[in-house]
From Swiss-Prot:
A Gene Ontology molecular function term of the record: protein-L-isoaspartate (D-aspartate) O-methyltransferase activity
UniProt subcellular location: Cytoplasm
Cited NCBIfam families: pimt (TIGR00080), PRK00312.1 (NF001453)
Organism this protein belongs to: Shewanella amazonensis (strain ATCC BAA-1098 / SB2B)
Catalytic residues in the record: S62
Keyword Transferase: yes
EC number, UniProt record: 2.1.1.77
PROSITE patterns: PCMT
Name of the molecule in the record: Protein-L-isoaspartate O-methyltransferase
Function: Catalyzes the methyl esterification of L-isoaspartyl residues in peptides and proteins that result from spontaneous decomposition of normal L-aspartyl and L-asparaginyl residues. It plays a role in the repair and/or degradation of damaged proteins.
Domain of life: Bacteria
């Protein structure tokens, strides 16, 4: 594993390896990304705990294991163009931007989008396109996408996102309300195969924009 990250970030990546994450590129990206940059100063001391944390606006930064697991699932086919639905703090986007040539990310809460854009700029990540909008609708004029990652739980599968997958593309999405499951959905022509990965708990994927 690349050892250029901070000691605490490297230790987190080692813990994720012990938890079953095996993609070395994903682990390196986590080891080299300062998670504290994506949190309020009052929570910075918790940055490398394997737990979800609040980021304001009723949203959270996902626990590092889930970030790593979803990224690993996205990266199985080494995608060229990826869509992230739910930019949030920007942490997941930062991890993805280090791994794929082109990342598009959508956020419905303007304040979060502005903060995330500033953070990724400070990290010198310039292969990311940001959109303020409704994630349920995707980003049709930038697709199709080799992979789509949704970082909030949908009550049902968003049809627009399925349609924006390229042939062989994968949608990684938590689905459900009280009982949620992380699904990996692969497009084959006009058909889609679905695999249940594990049980998860995410904030809900909400329709529409929030200023």
């Amino acid at each position: 594993m690349n050892q250029t990250g901070s000691t605490v970030a490297i230790n987190l990546a080692k813990k994720l390896y012990d938890a079953g994450i095996r993609d070395n590129l994903v682990l390196q990206a986590i080891a080299n990304t300062p998670r504290e940059m994506f949190l309020d100063a009052a929570l910075a001391h918790k940055a490398y705990e394997n737990t979800a944390l609040p980021i304001g606006q009723g949203q959270t930064i996902s626990q590092p294991y889930i970030v790593a697991r979803m990224t690993e699932l996205v990266m199985q086919n080494r995608p060229q163009r990826v869509l992230e639905v739910g930019t949030g703090s920007g942490y997941q986007a930062a991890i993805l931007a280090k791994l794929v040539p082109e990342l598009c990310t959508i956020e419905r809460i303007k304040a979060l989008q502005i903060q995330a854009r500033q953070r990724l700029k400070r990290l010198d990540l310039h292969n990311v396109s940001f959109k303020y909008g409704d994630g349920w609708l995707g980003w049709p004029n930038r697709g199709p996408f080799d992979a789509i990652m949704v970082t909030a739980a949908a009550a049902s599968l968003p049809t627009a996102l399925l349609e924006q997958l390229s042939e062989g593309g994968r949608l990684i999405i938590p689905v459900g309300e009280d009982a949620q499951q992380l699904l990996a959905i692969t497009r084959k022509g006009q058909e889609y195969s679905s695999e249940v990965i594990e049980s998860v708990k995410f904030v809900p994927l909400v329709n529409g924009n929030l200023a």
